[in-house]
Amino acid sequence: MKSKSKTVPDVATLTKAKAKVELMRLALEIERHDKAYYQEDAPKVSDADYDALRRRLEEIEHKFPELVSGASPSQKVGAAPARGFAKVQHAVPMLSLGNAFSDDEVAEFLQRVRRFLNLGDEIPAIVAEPKIDGLSLSLRYEQGELVRAATRGDGSVGEDVTANVRTLKDIPHTLKGNRIPAACELRGEVYMLKSDFLALNKKQEEAGEAPFANPRNSAAGSLRQKDVAITASRPLKFFAYAWGEFSGETPERTQHDMLGWLDHAGFVVNPEITLCHSVDDALVFYRRIGEERAALPYDIDGVVYKVDRLDWQARLGFAGRAPRWAIAHKFAAEQATTILEKIEIQVGRTGALTPVARLAPVTVGGVVVQNATLHNEDYIKGVGNDGQPLREGRDIRVGDTVIIQRAGDVIPQVVDVVLDKRPADAVPYEFPQACPVCGSHAVREDGEVVRRCTGALICPAQAVERLKHFVSRLAFDIDGLGEKQIELFHERGWVKEPVDIFTLKTRNATLKLEELEGYGETSVRNLFAAIDARRTIELHRLIFALGIRHVGEGNAKLLARHYGTIDAFLGAMRAAAAGQTEEGNTSEAYQDLDNIGGIGDIVAEAVVEFFAEERNVEALDALLGELDEVLPAAQVKRDSAVAGKTVVFTGSLSKFTRDEAKAAAERLGAKVAGSVSKKTDFVVAGEDAGSKLTKARELGVSVLSEDEWLALIQG
């Protein structure tokens, strides 16, 4: 199958319909990265790449303001609080900042401020402060006493880390001075000194534990510990620089003077903060602090500019997720050159082949870097995700002198090649066409930049996740065999492929499951009974359980209904796989598959790729040898009373489970939806029905009880 790079269209060329789809894609990607950064303290992309995603989203929303929704990343901050900590509602939201990446954008920011305030030629004073790369924190004081500390979370709701925060020496338990409000939220950044970070990582390595990636991650991970003693043992620091709720009037009238008040109240305020009276002053500060960045004892990733007068801040207010009176001027990423010694391919849990650069050790921004991401095969060739040349088309080869960048001090990446230092014997890198772990052929779908292993059922790199999928609720759903059991059995080498689940009983004389902690003869007997009960399985569940890319529950049901039986399905798939060529697939079996309503090219190609890998077929044949029966698909009744109708089930159903209700409705030709809209025909409401029932009544959608639904479908 021929592959091509996914083209990202210019915003100016987007239609409204395409813009809506692109906004959805960007929102999902940004949400995933927000969760990694704010909840997991493990960012997956550089600041520069993340900022690029947000800028594209904001450009599209600027062109199509009618597409902006309350759920857009431009309207919210961070990620929802992680499980495990109590939730805290911020009295005043902890918003994020807009970004500037050039001197011109800083000048434009000040121009906007002047226009909004109608200042004419007057230049507003600006407070410039280093942007600390740490974890934002809000501290609530009542009658001067610290009563609660919370992380930013999603900006509205954070995590309660009060007990941990009380161990930080930089945070006063009682405010000092005589102008203390009845209640206030004081804010700042938890961080770790570079020297303390290096010492902590040395201890981690000596203890055989994984080192932290950077000071920001170590600070966030140290603060968000369940064991307060661990937090207390970590050298965490805190700079105060802002406030949220403040009962009564603030004791000062400017940002700069309020920082002085915070200092007198007992907080540490960054001594580098400077009051600027022009754009030039602000940019001089930016360049000076940038030059001193490496020598600073803590990590920073830019400079924050804030309008000094608080009454002007109040007038300027907010625009979406960010204040109009402040902006972050980001630094360019730190870089260094070194030798690319090797390119290795890592295979992820979903089969994605990711190239990793193994480098001669080099210090970038104070951190020794030996590995860096190469993203994908197009990136190595010098082609961007939009199909346009990268690095003026320069490819990356083993032996090259390469430029390494730590953008935002997160994941190092190879950003360019020094061509005049390229060895004479360096050859273009050939990306593997087979999985380096299992040997299955690796394919790249049209429009994608990632090449994936097709050995879904047999690849060790994917095994655990595939097996978890195999036993999931919509697949084989084996009672007593969940994710933890799969991890345990796989770790011990007992279950490597799906068929191994069904041979556990015959192998148990050797395995002795009953001797495992938490198991006994009764629990093992029950597990084997549950496995035996699944030796008879519905065709759509089996298809879903195979873990074929793009084949979710809905597509599995479409395939099952079309082919009817396992024999017909397998025969068609083998015929379609046999007709596959580099130029495409013109076999009758493939055309039949491609023409199934709701399937289409992408799904059809993914299914054929799965069956083109002979070892997948062998693994499936072995599994079928252990099953008693694969039940034929129930045929949909096109003439039922609910055929073609959209139905939503809500509340607690007493006469059938939600899955049974859904299956019955689909057999009768109905579409089961998860939410109520104007297109919904029926809402079947059980006990304790909530918001869906309310919305149905508001929209005038027909609401049925269980008995009324049964009467309708039984006709």
From Swiss-Prot:
It comes from the Bacteria. One of its GO terms (molecular function) is DNA ligase (NAD+) activity. Its EC number is 6.5.1.2. Residues 637-715 form the BRCT domain. GO terms for cellular component: cytosol. The keyword Manganese applies. One of its GO terms (biological process) is DNA repair. Gene3D superfamilies: 5' to 3' exonuclease, C-terminal subdomain, 6.20.10.30, BRCT domain, DNA ligase/mRNA capping enzyme, Helix hairpin bin, Nucleic acid-binding proteins. Its cofactor is Mg(2+); Mn(2+). It is an enzyme of class 6 (ligase). InterPro entries: BRCT_dom, BRCT_dom_sf, DisA/LigA_HHH, DNA_ligase, DNA_ligase_AS, DNA_ligase_CS, DNAligase_adenylation, DNAligase_N. PROSITE patterns: BRCT (PS50172), DNA_LIGASE_N1 (PS01055), DNA_LIGASE_N2 (PS01056). The active site is at K131 (n6-amp-lysine intermediate). Keywords: DNA damage, DNA repair, DNA replication, Ligase, Magnesium, Manganese, Metal-binding, NAD, Zinc. Zn(2+) binds at C435, C438, C453, C459. NAD(+) binds at D47, A48, D49, Y50, D51, S96, L97, E129, R152, E189, K306, K330. It catalyses: NAD(+) + (deoxyribonucleotide)n-3'-hydroxyl + 5'-phospho-(deoxyribonucleotide)m = (deoxyribonucleotide)n+m + AMP + beta-nicotinamide D-nucleotide. The keyword Ligase applies. Belongs to the NAD-dependent DNA ligase family. LigA subfamily. DNA ligase that catalyzes the formation of phosphodiester linkages between 5'-phosphoryl and 3'-hydroxyl groups in double-stranded DNA using NAD as a coenzyme and as the energy source for the reaction. It is essential for DNA replication and repair of damaged DNA. This is DNA ligase. The lineage of its organism: Bacteria, Pseudomonadati, Pseudomonadota, Alphaproteobacteria, Hyphomicrobiales. The gene is ligA.
